[in-house]
C-alpha cells in the first residue's frame, strides 16, 4: 500500500500500537534514517517487524532484508498471506497501488503470431511401424544408401493470433491438435529440426531482435527435477539463476520518486518488494511467496524424489514445475497442462493467483488445460480453441458459446463449456449438441467452423489488429530481455558449484559405499599380491606388472558410475540450458573440479593399502609418485565417462561406448598386448590410451628404482630388461611426461564434456515412424463408440466392506504418522463409488491399504470381501487395480498388452476365440482400435501419449473380467472428451454388476454425477462424507448446506469443485468446525454403519468365494505367455540387442587385428601370453558389456513385474525362466560372431573339438555375465547401486581370472575365490582346449618346456580337467539364473 507521508505514518502507527510497540515519532525517525542512507543501502533496508513461530510480533526496526533468515522469511509471508484466496489479491493490489502512485508504467508484452506453419519429418516404413532388430538394420542401411522414405507431417497449419497483456488466455483442444507445439513456438523453444514458417513477435520485435527464452517462460508437461534437491532448494536455485529482472531498478525508481513526493510506503510492502529484488542471493523471499500460493509450504523441505527414491507426490511435483518457472521475474507465461494430478480446488486456487498476477502486474499468460472446471474456466478472459493443427476460435471467453450457437450447436445446461467445446468439434460427439431441430443435422467440419469464425465480427477484428503494424515507439524495452543470462559468469559458476556440492552431499552414501568397496577390493588385491615385489627376477617382475595393471583397471572401472550419474542428470541440465539458466561450461567446471577430492581420496586409499604390502620400492618419494599417477588416471577416467555420457546420452548406447572405451584403453594399454607385438600401423592406439601413460609412469617409477639396478648378462639393469620386454623403456624421465599426459587427457575430456553439452542437440523424443499402409488410409475412423460393455463372461458380484481401518507409518525421525484414521465404508456391486478429497487426503493410500498393496506400515481394522475376511490371493484374482502411474512393458503393442493380460488372467476354460473377442471389445470400448498396433514405449521418450497410456492402463484391467475394480485417478492426464469416454466405459462396467471404485481429482459435472456414491476425505485420512450423490448431486449438497456459513452453490457450477472448496483446510478454519467429527456425529454416519452391517450379514448368507489355485493359468501356460512377451520385447529392443551384437563384433575385430595369426607360432612364453591376452580381452570385455547393458533392460521390466505379480498373473518362476531363456538366442548369436571373426583371424587350430570349446566357453561367458547383471538388478533397490556393485565385480573376476595372477601363485587363503570366479574357468577351458595337448617345446623364462607342461606349471591348467571345466561352466549360469528366480520372487523394493 502507498499513501501520503502522514497517512503512511498513521497506518504504521496503528499497526504497531495495537501490539504495544512503536509510536508515530519513532517510526517517522526510523523512516527518515532510511531515506538518508546511500542508495545502495536504502534499496536493501526496510522497517521490518520480526515474528516468532507463534506469530507474536516484536518491535519494528530498521533491518537489512538481504540478511533475513529462513524463519524470518517464512513467518513474514505467512503474516502477509494468511488465506491465499484473498490475501494474495490484497498484496498485489497494494504493490500495484504503490507503483501507480509514483506514476510508473509496468512493462508489458503482447505476443503476436501470423500464418504460423510447423512441419515435422517422419520416417515411412512398410508394414507395422515397430522398431524390431530387422527394421533397425534396414533403416540404417536405407539411410546409408539414401533410399529411405520421409514424409512431412503438418503440426500447425497457418495459425494466427494475439496473446494480450493483463489478460489470461485458455488454450483448449483435443490431443495431438498442436497445443504444445504452439506453446513451444510462442516461447521460442521449438526443436530446430522442425520446419517453421510465419512470424512471431513480442511488442513488434521478432525473435532475432531479443532473447525470447529469457523474455517468456514455458511450463512443460514433463516434471523434470533433480530428485536429491528439496522443493525449496529447487525453487531457490531456479530463482537465483533467473535473477530479479527489472525488479531492482524498479524498486530503486519507486524509492527515488517516493522520496521526492514525500510518500511513506506500507512498511511490509516496502520490505517485501526490497527483499524480492535482491540479486545473487542463495535464498529469496520470492521462493517463500511461491511456496505459499502453490500450496507447497507443507513439503518445502521434502526432497523431490523419483521412481526409486521417496519424495513428493505427483500433484506436488506438477506444482513445483509451475513454481520453478514463475519464481523468476518473467511475466510472459506459456503453461502446458499445469493441472495434471491436481484436484479442482487446488487448480482453481493456483489459476486465481495467476489471474490476479496477470491483471495487477500486467502479465501475459496462455495456459492449456485438459479438464477445466466451470469455475476455473470462468477465470480466463480469452480462449483459443484448436483442432487438427488449426485455430477454430480465438477471442473473448464470454462469446464462444454464442459463436457455436450461430453455427447450430448449443451447450446444454449443467454442461461444462470446456467439455462442450472439445466434443462439439469431434465427429463422434458433435451430433448431440445440434440445436436446429427444424434442420437435418449434417457434420460440420473444422474447416467450416474456421471459415465461419473468419467471417464473424470477432474474426474480422482479429484480422484487422494483425494487419496493423505494432507501434514500437510505444514499446517498453524493460519487458524484453536482451541478455542470455541473468547472472555474471562468476555468480553462475558459484551457484552451479554450490548446487553440485549439495548434490554430492546428498549422494554421500554412494561415494562412501564406492570407497568402501574400493577398500574391500584393495584389501583383496594386497593380500593376493602379498610381498610379490620382494623377489626381484623376471618371473616376479611379470607378477608385479600384473598387480600394476590390476590397479589401473580397478581405477578405470571405478569411474563407470560417473557415466550413469551424468546421464541421470542430463535431462534436467538440457531443460535448464534451454531456459538459459546457465551455460554448459558453468555446469561442467564444478562437475569436474568438485570430483577432484573424490579421486584424491580413492587413489590415496588404494595406494596406501597396496603399495607397501605388495612390495613395491619402499622409498617414500616413489610411493607419492605412484599415488600421483593413479590420481591423474582416476581423474582422466571419470572425465572420459562424463564426456561419453554427454555425447551419447542414451543409457544403453552410452554404456556400450563406455565398455568399448575400456576395451580400447586396456588393449592398447601396454599390458594385454605388448607395444612391440602391436601391428606398426596400430601403434597410434598405444599413444592415445591414458592407460598406456599410466603404465609407463608406474613402471618407470618402479623399475628404475635402485633395487632393480642389478646388471644382467645383456649389460642392462634388470629393471631395464623387464621394461624392454614390454616395450615400456622410455627412460627415467618418462614418469613426468606420463603424468603430464594424464593431466592433458583430463583437460581434454572435460573440454569434450563441456563442448558436447554446449553444441550437441538436446535429448528429445525418438523420430516419428509411420506405416506406409496406414499413411494411405484416412486419418478419421468412423466407427461407433461402443455404447455398452457387453462382456458377458460369468463373474461373482462381490461386496467389499471395511470398518475402522487405520494405517500408521514410522517417519525417518522415528515418529508415528497416521495416514488413515478410522475409515469405514462399503463398496457394493453395481454401484459406482467416487473417492474424492484434496491432494494428500489419503485417497490412494486407502485404495492401496484395501487392495493389500502396502509393503510397510501398520494396518488395523476389518476388511471383508463377500462377508468374509479378505484373503489376499483370492482377492488379487477377482479384482483389478488401475494404478495412477501407467506402468507397461514398453516394447509391446497396445493390442498385445491386452492379449497378454487376457491370456494370463482369464481362466483356461475360456477359449482363445472368446479371449480375442473380449480384447477387441475392450479396444473398441476404450477407443484404442486406431492405435492397437502402436508400441507402448517409454513415457516422455517414445510411444503412446499420456492420455493413450492412461486408457491402456484401464483396458489392461478390463480384459481380466474382475468382480471388483479399483481405479486410481483414471481421468488424470486426459482431456475432457477422453475422460468422458473412459467414464462412460467405467459406468457401463458398473452396470454389469461389478463393484467399481475410482479416485478422482477434477471431474466435470457429467463425470462427477455419473457416480452413485461418494466418499469424501480430508487431510489425515478422515472421512467427512460417505453417502449417495443424489440426482444433480442433491444429497451431498443438502448435507453440506446444513452447515452454518457454507456458501450456496452457484447455478451451473460444478458441485465437485464446490465441495472441495468448502471442505478445504482454510474453509474449515473459517467455518470453525471439524468436518470429520461432524460426520461421525451425524445421522448419516449411523445409517451408514447399519447399512454396512446389513450388507455384511446379507453377504454372509452366500458361499465363500474359493478359487482352486492362486493363478488363472497353469504353470506351463504362464511360462508360454511370459516367454512370448519376453521374445517380443527383446526382438523390438534394438538399442539393447543390436548394440551388444555390434560391440561383440567390434571387440572380435579388434582382437583379430591386434593378434593377427599369433596363435599359429608359439615359440616362447610371450607368444602364449599374447594368445592368452586375446582370450582374456574377449571374455572380460564382452562379459562386461553384456552385464552393463542388461541392467537397464531388466530394471525397466522389474516395475512391470511388480504390478503383474500383484495381480497374480503368474508365478515368479515362470517369469524368471522366460527371462532367462530369452537371453539364450542372442548369446548364441554373439558366440557365433566370435567364432566366425576371431578364430580365423587369430589363427587358432581348426578341429571340431577345439572350435566347439571356443564356442561353448564364450557362450557360457555371455550367459554368466548376463545372468549376473539380472541378479544385480533384483537384489538392489535401484540401478545406481547395481552399477556401483557391478564395477567391483569386474575387478574381482579380473583379479581371480588367472591372467594378472596365475593360479599357482594365488595365496591359499584366496584360492577359493579363484574357483568362484567364472572367468578363471572360462580362460582355463579356452587356453587348455587349444594348447593343453601340444607337446611342442618353447622357451619359457629362459627354460625349455613343453607347452602342456608350461600351462600346468605357470597357469595350473591340465588337459585332463576339461570335463570338469565343461560341467562348471554350465553350472555357473544355471546357479545365477536360479538365484535370479529366487530373489525376484522374494524381494520387493517397491515401497508403498
UniProtKB/Swiss-Prot annotation:
ATP 2 binds at residues 837-844. It is found in: Membrane. Keywords: ATP-binding, Membrane, Nucleotide-binding, Repeat, Transmembrane, Transmembrane helix, Transport. Signal peptide: none annotated. The chain crosses the membrane at residues 509-529, 543-563, 596-616, 627-647, 652-672, 739-759, 1136-1156, 1175-1195, 1215-1237, 1255-1275, 1281-1301, 1309-1329, 1364-1384. It is a multi-pass membrane protein. CDD domains: ABCG_PDR_domain2. Residues 1-26 are annotated as: Disordered. Confined to shoots. This is ABC transporter G family member 42.
Amino acid at each position: 500500500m502507498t499513501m501520503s507521508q502522514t497517512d503512511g505514518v498513521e497506518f504504521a502507527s496503528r499497526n504497531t500500537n495495537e501490539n504495544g510497540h512503536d509510536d508515530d515519532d519513532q517510526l517517522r525517525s526510523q523512516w527518515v534514517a532510511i531515506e538518508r542512507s546511500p542508495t545502495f543501502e536504502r534499496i536493501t533496508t526496510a522497517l521490518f517487524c520480526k515474528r516468532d513461530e507463534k506469530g507474536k510480533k516484536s518491535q519494528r526496526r530498521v533491518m537489512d532484508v538481504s540478511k533475513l533468515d529462513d524463519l524470518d522469511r517464512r513467518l513474514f509471508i505467512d503474516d502477509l498471506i494468511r488465506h491465499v484466496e484473498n490475501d494474495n489479491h490484497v498484496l498485489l493490489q497494494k504493490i500495484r497501488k504503490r507503483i501507480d502512485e509514483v506514476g510508473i508504467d509496468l512493462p508489458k508484452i503482447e505476443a503476436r503470431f501470423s500464418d504460423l506453419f510447423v512441419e515435422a519429418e517422419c520416417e515411412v516404413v512398410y508394414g507395422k511401424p515397430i522398431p524390431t532388430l530387422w527394421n533397425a538394420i534396414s533403416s540404417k542401411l536405407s539411410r546409408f544408401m539414401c533410399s529411405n522414405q520421409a514424409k512431412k507431417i503438418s503440426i500447425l497449419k497457418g495459425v494466427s493470433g494475439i496473446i494480450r497483456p493483463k489478460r489470461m488466455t485458455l488454450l483448449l483442444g483435443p490431443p495431438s491438435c498442436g497445443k504444445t507445439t504452439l506453446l513451444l513456438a510462442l516461447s521460442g523453444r521449438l526443436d530446430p529440426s522442425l520446419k517453421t514458417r510465419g512470424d512471431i513477435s513480442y511488442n513488434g520485435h521478432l525473435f532475432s531482435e531479443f532473447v525470447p527464452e529469457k523474455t517468456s517462460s514455458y511450463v512443460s508437461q514433463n516434471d523434470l527435477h533433480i530428485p536429491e534437491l528439496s522443493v525449496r532448494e529447487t525453487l531457490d536455485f531456479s530463482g537465483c539463476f533467473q535473477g530479479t529482472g527489472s525488479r531492482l531498478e524498479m524498486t530503486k525508481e519507486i524509492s527515488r520518486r517516493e522520496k521526492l513526493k514525500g510518500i511513506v510506503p506500507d512498511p511490509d510492502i516496502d520490505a517485501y518488494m526490497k527483499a524480492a529484488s535482491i540479486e545473487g542471493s542463495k535464498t529469496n523471499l520470492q521462493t517463500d511467496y511461491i511456496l505459499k500460493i502453490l500450496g507447497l509450504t507443507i513439503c518445502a523441505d521434502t526432497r523431490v524424489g523419483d521412481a526409486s527414491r521417496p519424495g513428493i507426490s505427483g500433484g506436488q511435483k506438477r506444482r513445483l514445475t509451475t513454481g520453478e518457472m514463475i519464481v523468476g521475474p518473467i511475466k510472459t507465461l506459456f503453461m502446458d497442462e499445469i493441472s495434471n494430478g491436481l484436484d479442482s480446488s487446488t487448480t482453481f486456487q493456483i489459476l486465481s493467483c495467476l489471474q490476479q498476477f496477470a491483471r495487477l502486474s500486467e502479465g501475459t499468460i496462455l495456459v492449456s488445460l485438459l479438464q477445466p472446471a466451470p469455475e476455473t474456466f470462468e477465470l480466463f478472459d480469452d480462449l483459443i480453441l484448436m483442432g487438427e493443427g488449426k485455430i477454430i476460435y480465438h477471442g473473448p471467453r464470454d462469446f464462444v458459446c454464442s459463436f457455436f450457437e450461430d453455427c447450430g450447436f448449443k451447450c446444454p445446461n449443467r454442461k461444462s463449456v470446456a467439455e462442450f467445446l472439445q466434443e462439439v468439434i469431434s465427429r463422434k460427439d458433435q451430433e448431440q449438441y445440434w440445436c436446429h431441430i427444424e434442420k437435418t443435422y449434417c457434420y460440420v467440419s473444422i474447416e467450416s467452423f474456421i471459415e465461419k469464425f473468419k467471417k464473424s465480427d470477432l474474426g474480422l477484428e482479429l484480422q484487422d489488429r494483425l494487419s496493423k503494424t505494432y507501434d514500437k515507439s510505444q514499446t517498453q524495452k524493460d519487458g524484453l530481455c536482451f541478455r542470455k543470462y541473468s547472472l555474471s559468469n562468476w555468480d553462475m559458476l558459484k551457484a552451479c558449484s554450490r548446487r553440485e556440492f549439495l548434490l554430492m552431499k546428498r549422494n554421500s552414501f554412494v561415494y562412501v559405499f564406492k570407497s568402501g568397496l574400493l577398500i574391500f577390493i584393495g584389501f583383496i588385491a594386497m593380500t593376493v599380491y602379498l610381498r610379490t615385489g620382494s623377489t626381484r627376477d623376471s618371473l616376479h617382475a611379470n607378477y608385479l606388472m600384473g598387480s600394476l595393471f590390476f590397479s589401473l583397471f580397478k581405477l578405470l572401472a571405478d569411474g563407470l558410475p560417473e557415466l550413469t550419474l551424468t546421464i541421470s542428470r542430463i535431462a534436467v541440465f538440457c531443460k535448464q540450458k534451454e531456459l538459459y539458466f546457465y551455460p554448459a561450461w558453468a555446469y561442467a567446471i564444478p562437475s569436474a573440479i568438485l570430483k577432484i577430492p573424490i579421486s584424491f581420496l580413492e587413489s590415496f586409499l588404494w595406494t596406501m593399502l597396496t603399495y607397501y604390502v605388495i612390495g613395491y620400492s619402499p622409498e617414500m618419494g616413489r610411493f607419492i609418485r605412484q599415488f600421483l599417477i593413479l590420481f591423474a588416471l582416476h581423474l582422466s577416467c571419470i572425465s572420459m565417462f562424463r564426456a561419453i555420457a554427454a555425447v551419447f546420452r542414451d543409457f544403453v548406447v552410452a554404456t556400450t561406448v563406455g565398455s568399448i572405451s575400456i576395451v580400447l584403453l586396456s588393449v592398447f594399454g601396454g599390458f594385454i598386448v605388448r607395444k612391440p607385438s602391436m601391428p606398426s600401423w596400430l601403434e597410434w592406439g598405444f599413444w592415445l590410451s591414458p592407460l598406456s601413460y599410466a603404465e609407463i609412469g608406474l613402471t618407470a617409477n618402479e623399475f628404475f628404482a635402485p633395487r632393480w639396478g642389478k646388471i644382467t648378462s645383456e649389460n642392462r639393469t634388470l629393471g631395464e630388461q623387464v621394461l624392454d620386454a614390454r616395450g615400456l623403456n622410455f627412460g627415467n624421465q618418462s614418469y613426468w611426461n606420463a603424468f603430464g599426459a594424464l593431466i592433458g587427457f583430463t583437460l581434454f575430456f572435460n573440454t569434450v564434456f563441456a563442448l558436447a553439452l554446449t553444441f550437441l542437440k538436446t535429448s528429445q523424443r525418438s523420430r516419428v515412424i509411420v506405416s506406409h499402409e496406414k499413411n494411405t488410409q484416412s486419418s478419421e475412423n468412423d466407427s461407433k463408440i461402443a455404447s455398452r460393455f457387453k462382456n458377458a463372461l460369468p463373474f461373482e458380484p462381490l461386496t467389499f466392506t471395511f470398518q475402522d481401518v487405520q494405517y500408521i507409518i514410522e517417519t525417518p525421525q522415528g515418529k508415528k504418522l497416521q495416514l488413515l484414521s478410522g475409515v469405514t465404508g462399503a463398496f457394493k456391486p453395481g454401484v459406482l463409488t467416487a473417492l474424492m478429497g484434496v491432494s494428500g487426503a489419503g485417497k490412494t493410500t486407502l485404495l492401496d491399504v484395501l487392495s493389500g498393496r502396502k509393503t510397510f506400515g501398520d494396518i488395523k481394522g476389518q476388511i471383508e470381501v463377500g462377508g468374509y475376511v479378505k484373503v489376499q490371493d483370492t482377492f488379487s484374482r477377482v479384482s483389478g487395480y488401475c494404478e495412477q502411474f501407467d506402468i507397461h512393458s514398453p516394447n509391446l503393442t497396445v493390442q498385445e498388452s491386452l492379449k497378454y493380460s487376457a491370456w494370463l488372467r482369464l481362466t483356461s476354460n475360456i477359449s482363445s476365440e472368446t479371449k480375442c473377442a473380449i480384447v477387441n471389445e475392450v479396444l473398441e470400448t476404450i477407443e484404442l482400435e486406431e492405435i492397437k498396433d502402436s508400441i507402448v514405449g517409454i513415457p516422455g521418450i517414445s510411444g503412446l501419449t499420456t492420455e493413450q497410456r492412461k486408457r491402456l492402463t484401464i483396458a489392461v484391467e478390463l480384459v481380466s473380467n474382475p468382480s471388483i475394480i479399483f481405479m486410481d485417478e483414471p481421468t488424470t492426464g486426459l482431456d475432457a472428451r477422453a475422460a468422458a469416454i473412459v467414464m462412460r466405459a467405467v459406468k457401463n462396467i458398473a452396470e454389469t454388476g461389478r463393484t467399481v471404485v475410482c479416485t478422482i481429482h477434477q471431474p466435470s459435472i457429467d463425470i462427477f454425477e455419473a457416480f452413485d456414491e461418494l466418499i469424501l476425505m480430508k487431510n489425515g485420512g478422515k472421512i467427512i462424507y460417505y453417502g449417495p450423490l443424489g440426482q444433480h448431486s442433491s444429497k451431498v449438497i443438502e448435507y453440506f448446506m446444513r452447515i452454518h456459513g457454507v456458501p450456496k452453490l452457484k447455478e451451473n457450477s460444478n458441485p465437485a469443485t464446490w465441495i472441495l472448496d468448502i471442505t478445504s483446510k482454510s474453509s474449515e478454519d473459517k467455518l470453525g468446525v471439524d468436518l470429520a467429527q461432524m460426520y461421525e456425529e451425524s445421522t448419516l454416519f449411523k445409517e451408514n454403519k447399519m447399512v454396512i452391517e446389513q450388507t455384511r450379514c446379507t453377504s454372509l448368507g452366500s458361499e465363500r468365494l474359493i478359487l482352486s489355485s492362486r493363478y488363472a493359468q497353469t504353470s506351463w501356460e504362464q511360462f508360454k505367455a511370459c516367454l512370448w512377451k519376453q521374445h517380443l520385447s527383446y526382438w523390438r529392443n534394438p538399442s539393447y540387442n543390436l548394440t551388444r551384437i555390434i560391440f561383440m563384433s567390434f571387440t572380435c575385430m579388434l582382437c583379430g587385428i591386434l593378434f593377427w595369426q599369433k596363435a599359429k607360432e608359439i615359440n616362447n612364453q610371450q607368444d602364449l601370453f599374447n594368445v592368452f591376452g586375446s582370450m582374456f580381452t574377449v571374455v572380460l570385455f564382452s562379459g562386461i558389456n553384456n552385464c552393463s547393458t542388461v541392467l537397464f533392460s531388466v530394471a525397466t521390466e522389474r516395475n512391470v513385474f511388480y504390478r503383474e505379480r500383484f495381480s497374480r498373473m503368474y508365478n515368479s518362476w515362470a517369469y524368471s525362466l522366460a527371462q532367462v531363456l530369452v537371453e539364450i538366442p542372442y548369446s548364441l548369436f554373439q558366440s557365433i560372431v566370435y567364432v566366425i571373426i576371431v578364430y580365423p583371424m587369430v589363427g587358432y587350430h581348426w578341429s571340431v573339438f577345439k572350435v566347439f570349446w571356443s564356442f561353448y566357453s564364450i557362450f557360457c561367458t555371455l550367459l554368466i555375465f548376463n545372468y549376473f547383471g539380472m541378479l544385480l538388478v533384483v537384489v538392489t533397490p535401484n540401478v545406481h547401486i547395481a552399477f556401483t556393485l557391478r564395477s567391483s565385480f569386474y575387478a574381482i573376476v579380473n583379479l581371480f581370472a588367472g591372467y594378472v595372477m596365475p593360479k599357482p601363485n594365488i595365496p591359499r587363503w584366496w584360492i577359493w575365490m579363484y574357483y568362484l570366479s567364472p572367468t578363471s574357468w572360462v580362460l582355463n577351458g579356452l587356453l587348455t582346449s587349444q594348447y593343453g595337448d601340444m607337446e611342442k617345446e618353447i622357451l619359457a623364462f629362459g627354460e625349455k618346456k613343453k607347452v602342456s607342461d608350461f600351462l600346468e606349471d605357470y597357469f595350473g591348467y591340465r588337459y585332463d580337467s576339461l570335463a570338469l571345466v565343461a560341467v562348471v561352466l554350465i553350472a555357473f549360469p544355471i546357479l545365477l539364473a536360479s538365484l535370479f528366480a529366487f530373489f525376484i520372487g522374494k524381494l520387493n523394493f517397491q515401497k508403498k
